[in-house]
Regions:
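Intrinsically disordered, low-complexity linkers and terminal tails enriched in Ser/Thr/Pro/Gly
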Residues: 23-32, 38-52, 56-67, 71-74, ...
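Bacterial N-terminal signal peptides that target proteins for export
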Residues: 1-9
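C-terminal motif of bacterial Sec signal peptides marking the signal peptidase cleavage site
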Residues: 18-21
Length: 448
């Protein structure tokens, strides 16, 4: 290690001397960038013996991750970083013993904390300050277990047709899925770059945007709550509800149910919504979803209804002919409850001029009723990350799998096993909570 360091140092000196000897007309000097990082924890925990925090820097262009260690409430400078866009994700754990010593309270298990800053563009020769505040996650309710949105090979498998969403009872008691709502939410895909300029595909002349580059829903035509429009709600493109009378669908602890746009066996020949007959050449690269508990039957697609799967109630069908997930990964997913979800208001996007408006409407969903949220954002090839539509209390970061017919999904990590029941990790930070894997209904993410 010592000799490697000396060799690196000699090489660095040699490179410096070489460029010093060159004229000013040669290639311009390129400076690395740096981050000044400070991670804080709630006051009741800040005297914990464990003062070390693991911080992951994720380069959104190269997908490379670097893990560093910092100390609570102390500035740490990370120097000589390649100039690029980064996600910065902090993770910290307190043991049950320390929790009791600090607070006097008994805990069921260790408490995991996290924080994140996403889409941070570094500048040459400049220091970027990032302050993170760790918060504890945890949902004593249903959570998203697996979201498979990418689809399989569109020529030799099932394309977009074999997607599914799996929802899991992460508690120690039986929950009833009746009237649980799920929404696929919209986002603005192209906002501001970190230099303050609009992305070349952004449309600021067409829509109202916030300073963060998200849709400014306060400007939507007829908005009833302009003051809270951007912070108190998310906006659903497709909104569904589990049927039932309140006691129809008991889900035991550690059990799950699957919602499939089409509850079919895609390993065998099937018919698409367009009436096309498909015979998969790669049956091992698609799924049998005929055992899904629920399917989603849009008007006109009744012939594809699996009579062994119960139909989800369609509250808002969006602008597609079927439940279509964003295969390139630019969408949010929320689970929520509401006493009268069919009466939630619908809005057009915030157009500057209504002559540009298309008829697509989005259901306004109160954040207060959301029990789990996952934001999916696949970085573009150049590393650009779409502006987060979710407030950080719903999801501090985002998750993604390889997109576009990759036959990959995101699945929630197993945090621990308690008397045979798997408890899934829920930090409200999808970058830490989920991993990419080959989709497999009812399967769990692989252990570390």
């Amino acid at each position: 290690m010592f000799w490697n360091y000396r060799i690196f140092l000699l090489m660095a000196v040699g490179v410096t001397l070489f460029f010093t000897a060159c004229s000013e007309d040669d290639a311009p000097e390129v400076h690395g960038a740096s981050i000044k990082l400070n991670v804080k924890l709630a006051k009741e925990f800040e005297k914990a013996k464990n003062q070390k925090v693991a911080v992951t820097l994720r380069n959104t262009s190269t997908r490379e991750e670097t893990v560093v260690e910092t100390t609570l409430n102390k500035d740490t400078v990370l120097a000589n970083l390649p100039v690029d866009m980064y996600d910065v994700i902090a993770a910290y754990t307190l043991s049950t013993e320390e929790i009791k010593a600090l607070t006097g309270r008994e805990a069921d298990g260790d408490i995991a904390f996290s924080a994140a800053a996403t889409g941070i563009q570094l500048s040459p020769g400049k220091e970027t300050g990032i302050d993170l505040e760790l918060t504890a996650g945890g949902t004593d309710d249903f959570v998203f277990k697996t979201i498979y949105y990418a689809g399989s090979d569109n020529k030799k498998a099932a394309g977009e047709d074999d997607c599914f969403i799996e929802i899991y009872n992460n508690t120690n008691r039986t929950l009833y899925a009746d009237s649980l709502c799920i929404a696929l939410t919209t986002m603005n895909r192209y906002g501001l770059r970190n230099n303050g300029k609009w992305h070349e595909y952004a449309q600021p002349q067409k829509f109202y945007f916030t300073p963060k580059g998200t849709y400014d829903w306060s400007k939507a035509e007829g908005m009833a709550d302009p003051e809270g429009a951007n912070d108190k709600y998310v906006y659903g493109n497709i909104v569904l509800m589990v049927p039932g009378n309140g006691k129809t669908y008991p889900i035991k602890p550690g059990q799950s149910f699957i919602i499939a746009p089409f509850a079919l066996n895609f390993k065998e020949p099937y018919t698409t919504v367009n009436g096309k007959e498909v015979k998969p050449e790669w049956p091992d690269s698609t799924l049998n979803l005929s055992n899904a508990e629920f399917d989603v039957v849009y008007p006109g697609n009744e012939e594809l209804d699996n009579k062994n799967a119960d139909n989800m109630v369609i509250l808002h069908k969006g602008n597609n002919r079927y439940m279509r997930l964003s295969r390139n990964g630019k969408e949010g997913y929320v689970l929520f409850r509401h006493p009268n979800p069919s009466q939630l208001p619908l809005y057009l996007r915030p157009y500057r001029d209504m002559k540009y408006a298309d008829p697509s409407q989005f259901m306004q969903i109160p954040v207060a009723g959301i029990i789990d949220a996952v934001e999916v954002i696949n970085p573009n090839a150049d590393g650009y990350v779409s502006p987060k539509a979710f407030p950080k209390q719903l999801d501090a970061s985002y998750a993604y799998s390889k997109p576009d017919y990759s036959f990959r999904c995101i699945s929630r990590k197993v945090s621990r096993v308690n008397e045979g029941r798997r408890i899934l990790q829920d930090l409200n930070n999808s970058a830490l909570d989920f991993v990419q894997m080959i989709p497999n209904p009812k399967a769990f993410a692989p252990s570390k």
